Amino acid sequence: MSGSAVVLCILDGWGNGNGDECDAIHAARKPFWESVVSGCPRSSLSASGEDVGLPAAQVGNSEVGHISLGAGRVVLQDLQRINAEIGEIHSNPYLLQFAEAIKNGRGVCHIMGLLSDGGVHGLQDHITQLARVLAELRIKVLIHAFLDGRDVSPRSAKKHVTALNDAVHSYDISIATISGRYYAMDRDHRLDRTEKAYEAIALARGPRYRDAMTAIESSYSEGISDEFLVPSVIGDYQGFSPKDGILLTNFRSDRIVQILSMILHRSQEVSNILGMVRYSEKIQVPSLFPPRNICNTLGEVVSKCGLKQLRIAETEKYAHVTFFFSGGKEEPFPGEDRVIIPSPQVSTYDLQPEMSAFPMTEVLVERIESRQYSLIVVNYANADMVGHTGNLEAVKKAISVIDACLQMVFNAAKKAGATMLITADHGNAEKMFDMRGTPFTAHTSNTVPLVLCNCDKRFGLVDGRLCDVAPTILELMEIAKPDEMTGSSLLTPE
């Protein structure tokens, strides 16, 4: 490689807003961004919808964003793939084998997943269709609903429960438990949260209500929104039986593997388990939609050139700069080092908006100054994770923290002769309220920035898509783009 070493900074949830009072990024104090970045070549990238392999108008998310950034091509995402094939799910051989085992044992099917129309981790329609197919096979279906309130409105669960009940009222299908995703979908090793969800789902332990609506209304009366609803048992549900089957409907892996692992270790008598997709190479559970092979991602190409690379993030986004950025491959490529910085142990990140950005940046600066890496990929989680809390002042502080960290990274990269490329995976923090003034905690479909700093050659940037970032980096490194990468370099000579 005769080109430049590159430091790719992914600012999770940092979208291009319109600069109004709802835009925390615009409102935050960020001297580095306004003085240095504003003078660098920059452009905008599409990070949602069909440009990242999602349905048209579907907001982007961290998994999809990192897959697109690393793959250098538009990858048909699991949501699109499942939507295209769910109509024929009744003939899926994995589902039929799963159902046959339940019928032979005279058990019931437990369906668990995110009851939401947000389409980020799961989709309510998938739960409904799978439940009806199984019920038509004369299998009793019990649903363990994970409430969202994060990728959708904070208090929208009653709408989703009503829609589910209306869709399945004529079938032998009922809700057995409900849990806020804060408990059922933790990914930060907060096992006390996962434990509460597991006990409700597997053991029928926890607050008990006659129906899901009553549980939700009780939670609202205590000022608790959907995301944080304490795992609760519905009706006379009694827990798992060894003859039962478990079907998980989330199609994104990072927030389902923790509770799945707990079920596998603590409910070993229940062996008939099926996932929507493959959740991990280390978890041997069959899936309705087996994984695709995404080869010649950015990391793989750099590795094949015999060059060293570094992936670094705090816990909340570690899977994104490793597993997802590498196209679903868990093991590091030859020459790839990984650093994980523990995320702070707080209940919600508005309580500590800086998260672990500063200690992570200290390690990052040391690694940049060592000059041993040709490619460094770092994720700053703050704008997204704090943005999801809906706390405007906390998000503004988070943005200021990122800005201070970027200044340190910029200085280190300049000293080491490395090019710094700043972008994001999707929008979030640039929209904190909706048109009614209600806190807006979901992702947006806005474009995201692409900024080129410290480049020793005179380049400009044109607008593009997330999948164009990998080809852009390869051009900076003077490495040939593989045929599999259909994205284009966004560099233009000045």
Curated annotation (Swiss-Prot):
Pathway membership: Carbohydrate degradation; glycolysis; pyruvate from D-glyceraldehyde 3-phosphate: step 3/5
SUPFAM superfamilies: 2,3-Bisphosphoglycerate-independent phosphoglycerate mutase, substrate-binding domain, Alkaline phosphatase-like
GO BP terms, alphabetized: glucose catabolic process; glycolytic process
EC number of the protein: 5.4.2.12
Residues that hold substrate according to the record: 121, 150-151, 181, 187, 252-255, 317
This protein's UniProt keywords: Glycolysis, Isomerase, Manganese, Metal-binding
Record carries keyword Transmembrane: no
GO cellular component annotations of the record: cytosol
Catalytic activity: (2R)-2-phosphoglycerate = (2R)-3-phosphoglycerate
Catalytic center residues: 62 (phosphoserine intermediate)
Keyword flag Metal-binding: yes
Binding site for Mn(2+) 2: 12, 62, 425-426
Free-text comment on the cofactor: Binds 2 manganese ions per subunit.
Gene Ontology molecular functions: manganese ion binding; phosphoglycerate mutase activity
Cofactor(s), by name: Mn(2+)
Entry superkingdom: Bacteria
Subunit structure comment from the entry: Monomer.
Entry's family note: Belongs to the BPG-independent phosphoglycerate mutase family.
Function: Catalyzes the interconversion of 2-phosphoglycerate and 3-phosphoglycerate.
Record's protein name: 2,3-bisphosphoglycerate-independent phosphoglycerate mutase
Biological source species: Anaplasma marginale (strain St. Maries)
Lineage: Bacteria, Pseudomonadati, Pseudomonadota, Alphaproteobacteria, Rickettsiales
Gene it is expressed from: gpmI
